[in-house]
Amino acid sequence: MSLTAGILAVQGDVSEHAAAIERAGQTHDTAVNILEIRESGQIPSCDVLLLPGGESTAISRLVHREGIADEIYTHARANKPLLATCAGLILLSRDSGDDKLETLDLLDVTVERNAFGRQRDSFEAPISVTGLDEPFPAVFIRAPAIVEVGDDVDVLAEWNGRIVAVRQDAIVATAFHPELLEDSRIHDLAFF
């Protein structure tokens, strides 16, 4: 079996996410073709889509200006798997807490940006994630927290009483960076 995985490649850990998706694919005997999304017209050929971290305001401006936002929306509305991490979570949210940031309103959540502090406050913590047998070593870098969820959103993980991972339909979103370690279970949970 094969799978085409699109990764929004305007910012973030593209190669690390690609490696994680490929590792997850290997555990399912699935060949993964990685497509780095940089312009409109690429997402329709993707089976799954990943929106990595970065600076959410810059990413929002780029995807809207380049016509990529409409394709992300169409992908999600077709109930195709989508994993959004950190800034990707903010981009998909209903409310980012910033009126200047245009979100896609695909995920019925409200987020608080930089909820765990600035860059120097980055940390790793083992968290229990629904669907995983063992705690996941989550890396938080300028991470948002989810402060409100809609009725159709399943909370997958919390850390210190704050929501850090959710699922709504075929969308999995995390406040942390699952790509920074050799553990590909979050990518597996989202795509396989």
Where would I find each of the regions flagged by the language model?
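N-terminal beta1-alpha1 cap of cysteine-dependent amidohydrolase-like domains
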Residues: 1-65, 70-77, 184-188, 192
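A structural micro-motif
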Residues: 3, 30-32, 80, 102, ...
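A secondary-structure boundary/capping signal
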Residues: 10, 85-87, 107, 142, ...
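Glycine-/small-residue-rich active-site loops that bind phosphorylated ligands and cofactors
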Residues: 13, 92, 181
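Short polar/acidic secondary-structure junctions
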Residues: 26, 96-97, 130, 146
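Redox-cofactor binding/interface segments in oxidoreductases and associated redox assembly factors
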Residues: 50-51, 84, 174
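Cysteine-nucleophile active-site neighborhood
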Residues: 56-128
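Amide-donor transfer/coupling interface in amidating biosynthetic enzymes
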Residues: 113-192
